[in-house]
Amino acid sequence: MSQRMQQGQPMIILGEDSQRTQGKDAQTMNITAGKAVAESVRTTLGPKGMDKMLVDSGGSVVVTNDGVTILKEMDIDHPAANMIVEVSETQEDEVGDGTTTAVVIAGELLDEAEELIDQDIHPTTLAQGYRSAAEKAKEILEQNAIDVSPDDRETLVKIASTAMTGKGAENAKDTLADLLVDAVLAVRDDEGVDTDNISVEKVVGGAIDNSELIEGVIVDKERVS
C-alpha cells in the first residue's frame, strides 16, 4: 500500500485522455476559464442588459437575464470556471441579488491579475493585494451604508422591487414587493429575520397578481364538487 494511502490521503486515478498543466500555463487556463464565465453574463447587466435564451438537451427553453439562473443552466466542467459560478451562488444565498455584478467584478479582477502576472508580479503578491483591497472596499461600504428601519416601509418596498427587476416576476413586482415586505415583517423578531419561517407555495391556475400572504397554515385540499 502506498504511503499516501496509509496517511489517509485520497488517491485519484485519472483517465488516459487527462492532461496535466502547471505553472504559467495552468494560471493562463484558469484565468481564461473564469473570464469566459464572466463574459457569458456581462451583456445581461444594467438597464440595457439583454435576455439570454437557453435551451437544454431536453429542448426546454429558458429566457432570462438573471445571472445565477443562466450559470445554473450552463454545463460547466472546468474547476476554475466553477469557482466563478460559486461566487454567484454565494451572492444569491447571502444577499438575494447582485449575482451578475459579482461575477462581472470577479472577471475584471482576473483580467487585471492576468496583466500583472504578465509583468512578472508573483501571484502571492497579487492575492495579498486583493485581500487588502477587499478590506478597504468593505471599510468604504460600511462608511457609506445607510441604516434602514423596519418602519421605513417605502424603502423596504423599493429594495424588494429592485431585487425582482430582470427576473420572471418583474411584471408583478409592485404587487409582490408589498407581499414580500409584509411576509418579512411578520416573521421578524429581536434577533432578525429567519426566512425559513416563510414558505412559498405554488397553486396551479390564476395569475401571479393573485398571490396573497397567509399568516397561518395552508392545507392543500381539492375542491369538493
Language-model segments: residues:
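Long, low-complexity regulatory segments enriched in Ser/Thr/Pro/Gly and acidic residues
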Residues: S2-Q6, P10-S18, A26-T32, T43-D93, ...
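Generic amphipathic alpha-helical segments used as scaffolds and interaction surfaces in large
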Residues: T21-T28, I117, I121-T124, A163-N171
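Structured ligand/cofactor/substrate-binding pocket environments in proteins
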Residues: K35
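Alpha/propeptide regions of enzymes that mature by internal proteolysis
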Residues: A38-V41
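Acidic/polar active-site rim loop that often engages polyanionic ligands
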Residues: L109-D120, E154-M164
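Long, structured protein-protein interaction/assembly regions in large complexes
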Residues: K138-S225
